[in-house]
């Protein structure tokens, strides 16, 4: 009986560890590029961003440092979701809000990359010809990478919720986080920045 509980507990933690690894790994390129590294810049990100990176634009550097830090926070969030000792009620709500928000935002963002890439490849949408080589990276690397991160955070949030004694408020916080992420994504899409 005890072995079954241990096995179930281990199975419940893998999504949190996957989310943590996703966040920490994804932070590496941001910090590398912020420190002036250029490997992978020209072949995997848009030409406009490449030019800003080459110029060491202060706004671009700030974005790289902030996104790198946010990815580290995502890694820490993944680890917080697998903590075996119980968190307090407020912390459980915050973890659910953040995990569902991150999960939905990442999955949506990745899905946009994939759908746009497939629409361009099908000839239904046109983009500037200089962006076509980059499109493959967004369609087949960055898009799936964001979707995988989103799925990891959502699965980690669900696994964490099963360990919380009182589900009601943390569940509501998760719904608010997920819907907030959808609303933010919709606004970004409508304004042309997402």
Please provide the spans of the model-predicted regions.
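Hydrophobic cores of alpha-helical transmembrane segments in multi-pass inner/ER membrane proteins
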Residues: 66-77, 140-156
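Perimembrane loop-to-helix junctions flanking transmembrane segments
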Residues: 42-57
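Final/C-terminal transmembrane alpha-helix of multipass membrane proteins
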Residues: 171-192
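Interfacial non-cytosolic loop connecting adjacent transmembrane helices
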Residues: 45-49, 113-138
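Individual transmembrane alpha-helices with interfacial aromatic-anchor signatures
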Residues: 14, 131-148, 169-176
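Core segments of alpha-helical transmembrane spans in multipass integral membrane proteins
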Residues: 55-79, 100-104
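N-terminal signal-anchor transmembrane alpha helix
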Residues: 16-35
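Cytoplasmic membrane-interface segments at the C-terminal ends of transmembrane helices
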Residues: 8, 12-15, 79-94, 151-171
């Amino acid at each position: 009986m005890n072995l079954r509980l241990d096995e179930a507990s281990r199975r419940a933690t893998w999504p949190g560890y996957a989310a943590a690894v996703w966040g920490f790994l994804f932070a590496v390129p941001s910090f590398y590029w912020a420190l002036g590294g250029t490997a992978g810049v020209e072949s995997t990100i848009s030409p406009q961003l490449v030019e800003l990176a080459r110029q060491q634009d202060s706004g671009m550097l700030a974005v790289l440092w902030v996104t790198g830090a946010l990815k580290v926070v995502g890694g820490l969030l993944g680890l917080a979701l697998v903590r075996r000792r119980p968190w307090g009620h407020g912390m459980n709500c915050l973890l659910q809000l953040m995990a569902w928000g991150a999960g939905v935002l990442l999955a949506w963002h990745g899905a946009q990359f994939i759908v746009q890439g497939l629409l361009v490849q099908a000839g239904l949408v046109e983009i500037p010809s200089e962006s076509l080589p980059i499109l493959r990276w967004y369609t087949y690397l960055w898009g799936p990478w964001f979707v995988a991160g989103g799925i990891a955070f959502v699965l980690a949030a669900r696994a964490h919720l099963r360990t919380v004694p009182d589900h009601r408020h943390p569940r509501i916080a998760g719904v608010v986080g997920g819907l907030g992420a959808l609303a933010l994504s919709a606004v970004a899409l409508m304004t042309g920045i997402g």
